[in-house]
Amino acid sequence: MWPPAIAETEEVGRIQDLDRQKLPLFSHIETQERVEQKMNLDTLKMEATTETVEVLVKPVGYVWTVFIKMIETWRLRCGARSCRCWCRFPWRISRPATTSPNRFTYTAARGTISLLRSAPELIVALFLVLAYGFGPIAGVLALGLHAAGFLGKFYAEDIENADKKPQEALEAIGAGKLKTLWYGVIPQVLPQYIAYTAYILDRNLRMATVIGLVGAGGIGQELKGRFDMFQYGHVMTILIAIFVFVFVLDQLQARIRAKLI
Protein backbone atom coordinates (compact mmCIF):
# COMPACT_ATOMS: atom_id res chain seq x y z
CA MET A 1 0.00 0.00 0.00
CA TRP A 2 3.03 2.26 0.13
CA PRO A 3 3.82 4.66 -1.47
CA PRO A 4 0.44 6.34 -1.89
CA ALA A 5 -0.69 7.06 -5.44
CA ILE A 6 -0.40 10.74 -6.33
CA ALA A 7 -0.17 10.89 -10.12
CA GLU A 8 -2.84 9.79 -12.55
CA THR A 9 -2.15 8.33 -16.00
CA GLU A 10 -4.39 7.71 -18.98
CA GLU A 11 -3.58 6.23 -22.36
CA VAL A 12 -3.45 8.88 -25.06
CA GLY A 13 -5.28 6.61 -27.49
CA ARG A 14 -8.32 6.52 -25.20
CA ILE A 15 -8.63 10.29 -24.85
CA GLN A 16 -10.98 11.84 -27.38
CA ASP A 17 -10.06 15.14 -29.06
CA LEU A 18 -6.76 15.46 -27.20
CA ASP A 19 -4.89 18.64 -28.14
CA ARG A 20 -1.20 18.01 -27.53
CA GLN A 21 -0.56 21.75 -27.57
CA LYS A 22 -3.08 22.45 -24.79
CA LEU A 23 -2.55 19.84 -22.12
CA PRO A 24 -4.02 20.17 -18.61
CA LEU A 25 -1.98 22.17 -16.10
CA PHE A 26 1.29 20.44 -15.05
CA SER A 27 0.51 17.48 -17.33
CA HIS A 28 2.82 15.90 -19.89
CA ILE A 29 2.90 12.99 -22.31
CA GLU A 30 5.44 10.23 -21.91
CA THR A 31 6.10 6.77 -23.32
CA GLN A 32 5.83 3.78 -21.01
CA GLU A 33 6.47 0.09 -21.40
CA ARG A 34 3.88 -2.24 -19.99
CA VAL A 35 4.31 -5.95 -19.44
CA GLU A 36 1.17 -8.02 -19.88
CA GLN A 37 0.49 -11.73 -19.70
CA LYS A 38 -1.13 -13.07 -22.86
CA MET A 39 -1.85 -16.57 -24.07
CA ASN A 40 0.16 -17.92 -27.00
CA LEU A 41 -2.43 -19.59 -29.23
CA ASP A 42 0.19 -21.92 -30.70
CA THR A 43 1.56 -23.27 -27.41
CA LEU A 44 -1.52 -22.49 -25.26
CA LYS A 45 0.78 -21.04 -22.60
CA MET A 46 0.81 -17.64 -20.92
CA GLU A 47 3.71 -15.50 -22.08
CA ALA A 48 4.89 -12.06 -21.03
CA THR A 49 4.63 -9.43 -23.76
CA THR A 50 5.93 -5.88 -23.66
CA GLU A 51 3.91 -3.06 -25.18
CA THR A 52 4.92 0.57 -25.63
CA VAL A 53 2.14 3.09 -25.07
CA GLU A 54 1.85 6.86 -24.82
CA VAL A 55 0.19 8.09 -21.66
CA LEU A 56 -0.94 11.46 -20.36
CA VAL A 57 0.56 11.95 -16.90
CA LYS A 58 -1.10 14.28 -14.38
CA PRO A 59 1.42 14.63 -11.51
CA VAL A 60 -1.20 15.36 -8.84
CA GLY A 61 -4.22 14.15 -10.77
CA TYR A 62 -5.31 11.47 -8.33
CA VAL A 63 -4.95 13.78 -5.34
CA TRP A 64 -7.35 16.17 -7.08
CA THR A 65 -9.75 13.29 -7.82
CA VAL A 66 -9.76 12.27 -4.15
CA PHE A 67 -10.32 15.90 -3.13
CA ILE A 68 -13.38 16.11 -5.38
CA LYS A 69 -14.72 12.87 -3.90
CA MET A 70 -14.20 14.21 -0.38
CA ILE A 71 -16.18 17.32 -1.32
CA GLU A 72 -18.95 15.03 -2.56
CA THR A 73 -18.81 13.20 0.78
CA TRP A 74 -19.04 16.57 2.55
CA ARG A 75 -22.10 17.40 0.46
CA LEU A 76 -23.63 14.08 1.52
CA ARG A 77 -23.07 15.09 5.12
CA CYS A 78 -24.54 18.58 4.59
CA GLY A 79 -27.52 17.17 2.71
CA ALA A 80 -28.13 14.73 5.54
CA ARG A 81 -27.98 17.63 8.00
CA SER A 82 -30.67 19.53 6.04
CA CYS A 83 -32.86 16.44 5.91
CA ARG A 84 -32.32 15.89 9.62
CA CYS A 85 -33.25 19.49 10.49
CA TRP A 86 -36.58 19.26 8.68
CA CYS A 87 -37.39 15.93 10.31
CA ARG A 88 -36.26 16.49 13.88
CA PHE A 89 -37.92 19.86 14.71
CA PRO A 90 -41.55 18.64 15.02
CA TRP A 91 -40.38 15.52 16.86
CA ARG A 92 -38.21 17.53 19.21
CA ILE A 93 -41.29 19.44 20.39
CA SER A 94 -43.84 16.60 20.31
CA ARG A 95 -41.62 13.81 21.67
CA PRO A 96 -41.12 15.16 25.26
CA ALA A 97 -44.06 14.57 27.57
CA THR A 98 -43.73 18.13 28.89
CA THR A 99 -44.27 19.84 25.52
CA SER A 100 -46.34 17.32 23.56
CA PRO A 101 -49.83 18.62 22.61
CA ASN A 102 -51.54 15.31 23.53
CA ARG A 103 -50.92 11.66 24.31
CA PHE A 104 -51.42 10.49 20.72
CA THR A 105 -48.81 12.92 19.37
CA TYR A 106 -46.40 11.88 22.11
CA THR A 107 -46.79 8.17 21.31
CA ALA A 108 -46.58 8.71 17.54
CA ALA A 109 -43.42 10.81 17.86
CA ARG A 110 -41.75 8.23 20.11
CA GLY A 111 -42.64 5.44 17.70
CA THR A 112 -41.34 7.33 14.68
CA ILE A 113 -38.04 8.18 16.36
CA SER A 114 -37.59 4.57 17.49
CA LEU A 115 -38.29 3.35 13.95
CA LEU A 116 -35.66 5.65 12.44
CA ARG A 117 -33.07 4.56 15.01
CA SER A 118 -33.74 0.86 14.65
CA ALA A 119 -32.26 0.39 11.15
CA PRO A 120 -28.52 1.03 10.59
CA GLU A 121 -27.56 3.52 7.88
CA LEU A 122 -25.85 0.83 5.82
CA ILE A 123 -29.00 -1.32 5.61
CA VAL A 124 -31.17 1.71 4.83
CA ALA A 125 -28.71 2.79 2.13
CA LEU A 126 -28.89 -0.65 0.50
CA PHE A 127 -32.66 -0.38 0.09
CA LEU A 128 -32.50 3.26 -1.00
CA VAL A 129 -29.90 2.41 -3.65
CA LEU A 130 -32.40 -0.09 -5.05
CA ALA A 131 -35.10 2.60 -5.05
CA TYR A 132 -33.11 5.62 -6.30
CA GLY A 133 -30.08 4.02 -7.96
CA PHE A 134 -26.40 4.68 -7.34
CA GLY A 135 -25.62 8.21 -6.26
CA PRO A 136 -25.79 10.69 -3.39
CA ILE A 137 -29.60 10.78 -3.01
CA ALA A 138 -29.64 7.40 -1.28
CA GLY A 139 -26.76 8.47 0.96
CA VAL A 140 -28.39 11.74 1.99
CA LEU A 141 -31.66 10.07 2.94
CA ALA A 142 -29.98 7.19 4.79
CA LEU A 143 -27.79 9.49 6.87
CA GLY A 144 -30.43 12.17 7.43
CA LEU A 145 -33.24 9.89 8.58
CA HIS A 146 -31.04 7.85 10.91
CA ALA A 147 -29.46 10.97 12.44
CA ALA A 148 -32.91 12.54 12.88
CA GLY A 149 -33.95 9.56 14.98
CA PHE A 150 -30.93 9.78 17.26
CA LEU A 151 -31.03 13.55 17.70
CA GLY A 152 -34.78 13.48 18.21
CA LYS A 153 -34.26 11.13 21.16
CA PHE A 154 -31.35 13.11 22.65
CA TYR A 155 -33.07 16.47 22.28
CA ALA A 156 -36.35 15.24 23.71
CA GLU A 157 -34.70 13.68 26.75
CA ASP A 158 -32.84 16.92 27.47
CA ILE A 159 -36.11 18.86 27.28
CA GLU A 160 -37.79 16.41 29.66
CA ASN A 161 -34.89 16.64 32.14
CA ALA A 162 -34.63 20.43 32.05
CA ASP A 163 -35.17 22.35 35.29
CA LYS A 164 -38.91 22.93 35.78
CA LYS A 165 -38.62 26.11 37.85
CA PRO A 166 -37.98 28.54 34.95
CA GLN A 167 -40.85 26.92 33.04
CA GLU A 168 -43.23 27.24 35.98
CA ALA A 169 -42.27 30.90 36.41
CA LEU A 170 -43.01 31.66 32.75
CA GLU A 171 -46.31 29.78 32.87
CA ALA A 172 -47.27 31.73 36.00
CA ILE A 173 -47.05 35.02 34.11
CA GLY A 174 -49.14 33.67 31.21
CA ALA A 175 -46.50 32.50 28.73
CA GLY A 176 -47.64 29.89 26.20
CA LYS A 177 -45.96 26.57 25.48
CA LEU A 178 -43.77 27.88 22.67
CA LYS A 179 -42.54 30.87 24.67
CA THR A 180 -41.93 28.65 27.69
CA LEU A 181 -39.94 26.27 25.50
CA TRP A 182 -37.95 29.08 23.89
CA TYR A 183 -37.12 31.10 27.02
CA GLY A 184 -37.31 28.49 29.77
CA VAL A 185 -35.93 25.32 28.18
CA ILE A 186 -33.72 26.09 25.16
CA PRO A 187 -31.15 28.16 27.14
CA GLN A 188 -30.68 25.19 29.49
CA VAL A 189 -30.23 22.53 26.81
CA LEU A 190 -28.33 24.56 24.18
CA PRO A 191 -24.82 23.38 25.24
CA GLN A 192 -25.94 19.74 25.03
CA TYR A 193 -27.57 20.40 21.65
CA ILE A 194 -24.33 21.80 20.29
CA ALA A 195 -22.37 18.80 21.60
CA TYR A 196 -24.83 16.27 20.16
CA THR A 197 -24.96 18.04 16.80
CA ALA A 198 -21.16 18.22 16.54
CA TYR A 199 -20.91 14.52 17.30
CA ILE A 200 -23.53 13.56 14.71
CA LEU A 201 -21.87 15.77 12.08
CA ASP A 202 -18.55 14.04 12.68
CA ARG A 203 -20.22 10.64 12.65
CA ASN A 204 -22.08 11.43 9.43
CA LEU A 205 -18.80 12.21 7.70
CA ARG A 206 -17.39 8.81 8.65
CA MET A 207 -20.64 7.01 7.84
CA ALA A 208 -20.78 8.76 4.45
CA THR A 209 -17.55 6.92 3.67
CA VAL A 210 -19.05 3.60 4.76
CA ILE A 211 -22.33 3.87 2.88
CA GLY A 212 -20.38 4.83 -0.23
CA LEU A 213 -19.22 1.20 -0.26
CA VAL A 214 -22.74 0.14 -1.28
CA GLY A 215 -22.96 2.70 -4.08
CA ALA A 216 -24.44 5.67 -2.22
CA GLY A 217 -21.82 8.09 -3.57
CA GLY A 218 -18.86 9.84 -1.99
CA ILE A 219 -15.33 8.72 -1.28
CA GLY A 220 -16.50 5.28 -0.14
CA GLN A 221 -17.52 4.35 -3.67
CA GLU A 222 -14.07 5.31 -4.96
CA LEU A 223 -12.43 3.38 -2.12
CA LYS A 224 -14.33 0.19 -2.91
CA GLY A 225 -13.57 0.46 -6.63
CA ARG A 226 -9.83 0.85 -6.07
CA PHE A 227 -9.79 -1.95 -3.50
CA ASP A 228 -11.58 -4.32 -5.87
CA MET A 229 -8.98 -3.56 -8.56
CA PHE A 230 -6.11 -4.24 -6.09
CA GLN A 231 -4.82 -0.69 -6.48
CA TYR A 232 -3.62 -0.42 -2.90
CA GLY A 233 -1.54 2.71 -3.51
CA HIS A 234 -4.77 4.52 -4.39
CA VAL A 235 -6.44 3.00 -1.32
CA MET A 236 -3.69 4.44 0.90
CA THR A 237 -4.15 7.88 -0.66
CA ILE A 238 -7.88 7.74 0.11
CA LEU A 239 -7.30 6.64 3.71
CA ILE A 240 -4.83 9.47 4.29
CA ALA A 241 -7.30 11.97 2.81
CA ILE A 242 -10.09 10.72 5.09
CA PHE A 243 -7.85 11.02 8.16
CA VAL A 244 -6.75 14.56 7.26
CA PHE A 245 -10.32 15.65 6.50
CA VAL A 246 -11.71 14.26 9.77
CA PHE A 247 -8.83 15.76 11.79
CA VAL A 248 -9.28 19.23 10.29
CA LEU A 249 -13.05 19.06 10.78
CA ASP A 250 -12.60 18.02 14.41
CA GLN A 251 -10.32 20.99 15.07
CA LEU A 252 -12.79 23.41 13.46
CA GLN A 253 -15.70 22.02 15.44
CA ALA A 254 -13.73 22.30 18.68
CA ARG A 255 -13.01 25.98 17.99
CA ILE A 256 -16.61 26.75 17.06
CA ARG A 257 -17.96 24.95 20.10
CA ALA A 258 -15.54 26.79 22.40
CA LYS A 259 -16.84 30.13 21.09
CA LEU A 260 -20.52 29.22 21.30
CA ILE A 261 -20.60 27.60 24.74
Swiss-Prot record:
Q: Does the keyword Amino-acid biosynthesis apply?
A: no
Q: Which residues cross the membrane?
A: 122-142, 203-220, 229-249
**Keyword line:** Cell inner membrane, Cell membrane, Membrane, Transmembrane, Transmembrane helix, Transport
Gene Ontology cellular component terms for the protein in this record: plasma membrane
Q: Name one Pfam family in it.
A: BPD_transp_1
Q: Where in the cell is it found?
A: Cell inner membrane
Which InterPro entries does this UniProt record tie to the protein? MetI-like, MetI-like_sf
Domain named ABC transmembrane type-1 is located at 47-253
SUPFAM superfamilies this protein is in? MetI-like
User: Does the keyword section mention Transmembrane helix?
Assistant: yes
User: What is its membrane topology?
Assistant: Multi-pass membrane protein
One BP annotation, GO:
transmembrane transport
Could you say which protein family the record assigns here?
Answer: Belongs to the binding-protein-dependent transport system permease family.
Function per UniProt: Probably forms part of a binding-protein-dependent hypophosphite transporter.
- From the Swiss-Prot or TrEMBL record, give the protein name: Putative phosphite transport system permease protein HtxE
